[in-house]
């Protein structure tokens, strides 16, 4: 399958050394850093004028609890301090189904991707009956969305 080589040309600012001329992307991978005033070493299929754009690296979220995306505004826990909040939500979380957990995981990954995060770490500590394979669900969702992930069991 042929991929498209795109030159992100002459960005206003870029946080990659020796890349003032931009980056060449082949499919989903950065394949070349282009020095200021230079052109890519190999032909490209398209060019994006980035002269009014800032090119940032993918962000990394190192601490998340994906399952909590479903209860972030749950009425039983709004405006409570941490331990009261946890006590209010544990009974809700213990009823979490694999389907709801998959949805929570997908929502978390998509929100992170939309905000520029390309790597996410989840500290998963919730294993009610029926969610013994929660980490498998998280890995499947990460693969389906193309986000890098590291999952820890708490």
Predicted regions located by residue number:
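A structural signal for short, well-ordered beta-strand segments
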Residues: 52, 149-153
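Active-site beta-loop-alpha junctions enriched in small/polar residues
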Residues: 65, 125-126, 152-154
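N-terminal metal-binding scaffold of metallo-dependent hydrolase/deaminase domains
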Residues: 1-42, 53-55
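Active-site-proximal flexible loops/turns
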Residues: 17, 68-72, 129
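Alpha-helical scaffold segments that flank or form the walls of functional sites
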Residues: 73-123, 128-147
């Amino acid at each position: 399958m042929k991929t498209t080589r795109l030159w992100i040309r002459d960005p206003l600012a870029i946080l990659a050394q020796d890349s003032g001329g931009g980056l060449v992307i082949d499919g989903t991978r950065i394949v070349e850093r282009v020095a200021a005033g230079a052109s890519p070493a190999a032909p490209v299929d398209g060019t994006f004028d980035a002269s009014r754009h800032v090119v940032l690296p993918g962000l990394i979220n190192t601490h998340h609890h994906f399952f909590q995306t479903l209860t972030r505004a749950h009425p039983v826990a709004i405006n409570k301090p941490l331990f009261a909040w946890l006590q209010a939500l544990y009974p809700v979380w213990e009823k979490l189904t694999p389907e709801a957990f998959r949805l929570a995981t997908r929502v978390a990954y998509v929100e992170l991707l939309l905000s520029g995060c390309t790597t996410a770490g989840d500290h998963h500590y919730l294993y009610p009956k029926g969610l013994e394979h929660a980490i498998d669900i998280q890995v499947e969702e990460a693969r389906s969305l193309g986000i890098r992930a590291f999952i820890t069991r708490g």
